[in-house]
């Protein structure tokens, strides 16, 4: 279900679904007569969508907010509007995707190059995105906008400020579920103290131990859209903090800290795992059947100190049940989807076993994590010291001129003396004939000009006159062709 906020006459969609696609720039279609064509220029998407590499977005619309513009529908009838091919993974098979109405560009939201709408009731319930509609929605399906964002989007400073106030990433950003405010008091409402110390069950807190420190993977994981059709988390590393020991306890779980684990789901479906069950109090828990029934977990996926436990998936229990049974005093947990009720843990406490000191176990866990972090920091410091020790060793570079066509082992070729100087060359060995000192090299720079830049290479005394060159054969004359090489020596020169 979408959420909208109004600020400075700008409407914003906070819950959307994003996909990737491409479009031909000249792809257009004719706008036919339609019963629903809203003006969506003021519809602003979340800030993260404008930065995402995925360019297609699906957003729920509200007919009472994004109303049909009858004058625009009559005026643009017959006009050519930009369109694009809908990806096959957007909708299930036999979905009426041909009923989409592509809109004129002036009516699209800012930053979109093409887009269309499905009018109210056009899409059947099975074809509507499950994350954009409440599970208990009744009546015809609301309109749906499907748009393709442009490659380069430039938003005004006012819009950027507005997006900063309502910044939200894709459907994977954690939120905290909050119950709706109400002044209504029910007949059997309990006081806060009675809710915490009620005789049928106790309200606990699910504490998930932080994961061990590990290096990030070089392979990025794609963002998986949240689904609430089944929910079977691994609770073996979860500590259930109870205010007092009782036979049955409940705790709100987090879809962020306690995500769905497919291996747990397969274990519950097989015959090899033992999934102990117990009877839930009928005066407390409603009778949930089908997909909303509680799932009993195998023993190896249970929290410590429990004989049996089960979980209610997100949205299976009504908000009214949470208000009457738990009240507003449940520990808030991060959720991926805050428009349905959070998942619930129900466990049967082990009476015969010794109680577990949860606080001591948490302290031991954090002490272990501190030791791991200290070892990692010590390893990083050692690597840094080794790197500095290698960098502090003085090494000389030698520039040689050779006639060999291939670079010798342990050397690498440079383009010019300037490049050798940039690499740290401090000496030059050359073989020259009795020619003028202003001979021009292949790189266009005079030798005298280069030597003037490095006076430290000049001799203090007057150079002795070079002997007259002996007559050389044709083969020896070819040795005068030079190639600039740089070789790394073991010590300083």
From Swiss-Prot:
Entry-linked InterPro entries: DM7
Keyword Repeat in record: yes
Top-level taxon in the UniProt lineage: Eukaryota
Classification via SMART domains: DM7
Annotated region (Disordered), positions in chain: 434-493
Biased composition (Acidic residues): 457-483
Transmembrane residue ranges: none
Disulfide bridges in this chain: none
Keywords in alphabetical order: Repeat
Similarity annotation: Belongs to the DM7 family.
Record-given protein name: DM7 family protein GM11958
Organism from which the protein derives: Drosophila sechellia (Fruit fly)
């Amino acid at each position: 279900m979408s959420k909208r906020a109004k600020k400075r006459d700008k409407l914003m969609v906070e819950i959307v679904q994003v996909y990737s696609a491409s479009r031909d720039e000249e792809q257009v279609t004719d706008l036919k007569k339609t019963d629903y064509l809203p003006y969506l220029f003021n519809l602003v998407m979340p800030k993260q969508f404008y930065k995402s590499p995925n360019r297609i977005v699906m957003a729920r619309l509200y007919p009472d907010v994004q109303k049909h513009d009858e004058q625009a529908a009559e005026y643009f009838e017959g006009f050519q509007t930009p369109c694009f091919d809908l990806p096959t993974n957007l909708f299930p098979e036999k979905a009426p995707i041909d009923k989409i109405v592509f809109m004129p560009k002036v009516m699209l939201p800012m930053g979109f190059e093409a887009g269309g709408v499905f009018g109210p009731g056009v899409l059947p319930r099975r074809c509507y995105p499950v994350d954009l509609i409440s599970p208990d929605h009744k009546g015809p399906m609301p309109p749906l906008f499907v748009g393709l964002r442009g490659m380069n989007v430039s938003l005004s400073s006012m819009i950027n400020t507005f997006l900063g106030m309502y910044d939200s990433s894709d459907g994977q950003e954690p939120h905290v579920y909050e119950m709706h405010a109400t002044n209504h008091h029910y007949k059997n409402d309990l006081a806060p103290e009675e809710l915490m110390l009620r005789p049928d069950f106790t309200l606990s807190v699910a504490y998930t131990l932080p994961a061990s420190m590990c290096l990030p993977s070089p392979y990025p994981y794609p963002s998986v859209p949240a689904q609430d059709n089944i929910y079977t988390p691994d609770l073996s590393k979860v500590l259930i903090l109870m205010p007092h020991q009782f036979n049955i306890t409940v705790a709100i779980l987090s879809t962020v800290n306690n995500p769905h684990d497919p291996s747990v789901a397969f274990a519950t479906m097989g015959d090899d795992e033992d999934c102990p069950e117990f009877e839930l109090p009928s005066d407390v828990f409603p009778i949930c059947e089908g997909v909303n029934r509680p799932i009993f977990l195998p023993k190896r996926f249970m929290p410590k100190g429990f004989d049996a436990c089960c979980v209610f998936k997100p949205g299976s229990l009504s908000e009214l049940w949470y208000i009457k049974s738990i009240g507003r005093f449940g520990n808030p947990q991060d959720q991926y989807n805050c428009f349905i009720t959070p998942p619930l843990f129900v466990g049967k406490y082990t009476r015969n076993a010794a109680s577990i000191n949860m606080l001591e176990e948490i302290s031991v866990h954090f002490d272990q994590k501190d030791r791991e972090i200290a070892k990692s920091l010590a390893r990083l410091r050692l690597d840094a010291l080794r790197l500095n020790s290698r960098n502090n060793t003085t090494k000389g570079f030698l520039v040689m001129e050779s006639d060999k066509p291939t670079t010798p082992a342990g050397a690498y070729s440079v383009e010019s003396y300037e490049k050798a100087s940039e690499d740290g060359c401090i000496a030059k060995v050359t073989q020259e004939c009795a020619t003028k000192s202003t001979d021009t090299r292949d790189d266009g720079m005079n030798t005298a000009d280069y030597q003037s830049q490095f006076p430290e290479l000049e001799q203090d005394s007057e150079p002795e006159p070079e002997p007259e060159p002996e007559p050389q054969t044709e083969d020896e004359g070819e040795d005068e062709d030079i190639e600039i090489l740089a070789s790394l020596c073991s010590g300083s020169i």
